[in-house]
Amino acid sequence: MAPRPRPGQLMLDEIREQPLVLERLWREEGAAVRALARRLRARRPPAVVLAARGTSDNAALYGRYLIETRLGIPVSLAAPSVVTLYGARVRWRGMVAIGLSQSGRSPDIVRFIEATRDAGALTVAITNSPRAPLARAADEVLVLHAGRERSVAATKTYTAQLTMLSLLVAHTAEDRRLIRAHEALPDAVASALETVPAVTDAAAHLSQASECLVTSRGYNFATALEAALKLKESSRMVAEALSSADLLHGPIAVVERDFPVIVVAPRGRALGHLSGVLRRLLRRRARTVVLSSVPRLLASAAVPVRLPDVQEEALSPHVYIVPLQLLAYHTARLRGLDPDRPQGLRKVTYVL
């Protein structure tokens, strides 16, 4: 009988596995992604709807930003209850509906994809389980090839979902620069794994706090949401994610001396705004953890987490989430918790 893993070992192993997962996805599913991209270009859908829950819902939000900015197609994030609770018949004909679920067994997502397919949408499943109900419900299936994810906290399937979405959009847009930029992702994610000394410093501060804020903007708003979710799941911390734009519309009032705020600030269109938000947080004496490659931002942080420059801003979420996954792990361990077995959680949640 194999020995029981140490607390959190499954989560840590799966975080470390991510560079190999992204390489395998590119290799195994590239042809399927290109074929679906051709079908999407031919279809020219007037809109896309993305259906997901939990971590997958954060990946879906990233997909919304990417599809709207790179393809110019309006995107809706699904409210599955419209179908499963209210039985509404929505006019989906001609549109594209994408369901994201690592297990492929979330009943409300499966039912939503079935309803959109029956209403005339082209349906796509993005899942780690090619034989799951979601895959059977969809017209097209993209498989994550992430291997079994044993920890309750999803890590490697999240970055795989981000990569699947960015590859699909890059090929649909026939954006050669964005396509080529994916080749550097495994190495960039491997570099992000080397942030452990800074991350453990941040965890030492967070483990003593009862709450924190996580903020970013644009593509990395999804990163902030996923980081907050991981801290809640693994560390039992009241972590709230806010767009840095929304943070200024009132919530910044809760920030006082030594209040922990995590700022995700890669180079890109949102950097100027995030720099201004960081200055305001510093004036309020917040204890800031800053993830960036920009020296002047890192120099102002209580805990700087230096990351490599990412060639394409649109791919920075794939890299910037990695130290935040590590942060959730280390914070949980410092609190004496097992992030592989969060209290009251299961790997698959059944909601209809």
Which sequence ranges carry the predicted segments?
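Generic C-terminus detector
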Residues: 4, 311-352
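Active-site phosphate/pyrophosphate-binding segments
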Residues: 6-10, 14-45, 49, 140-260, ...
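Glycine-rich phosphate-binding loops that contact phosphosugars or nucleotide phosphates
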Residues: 41-187, 217, 252, 264-310, ...
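Hydrophobic membrane-spanning alpha-helices of multi-pass integral membrane proteins
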Residues: 259-267, 320-321
